Amino acid sequence: MVGPWRFHGHAIVSADDRIAGADGLTPQALRNEADWARFQAALDRAAVTVLGRFGHEANPNLKRRNRLVLSSTARGLERRADAWWWNPAETDLADALVHAAPDGGIVVVPGGRRVFDLFLGVGYDAFDLARAERVTIPDGVPIFSAVAPGITAADLLVRHGLVAEVTEVIDTAADISLARWVCRAVP
């Protein structure tokens, strides 16, 4: 949590913790209606959604939800017709959020990898990690840069202070599970 904002990550990954193929695109095997419905409900509750430029351009904002697009081409923080555009190398997160979501609230973080990495460092309050248990994506894009042989997304979430609160199967036929990770209470 930073100020009045709570950071909630959302992703669906393959069994080998990939969010995209080598081409950077989300493969059809990671598209699931049960996960999509939960994700859309989370977006409806969000004060702002923070995502990368590629994701913003690939996913039209048909519902005109409030977006903060992370891009190294933005000059600090810019209000453009389609969204807030933010370069974290020039403007810090709290300053960007004061403008993009001045009343605080939930900041939904759906990626891509650079955005997931940034908020892993900031600190997630919660992370909904759906997993397609029967899907692998050799040479795909891992959810976090530090995912490597012997280091899973779950390992990284634990290292950054989260614990798996509950895991449930959200689509039995497709073997999709969802783990809700939450920030550990500080004694």
Tell me what each language-model feature is.
Residues 1-187:
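Enzymes that bind and transform nitrogen-containing heteroaromatic metabolites
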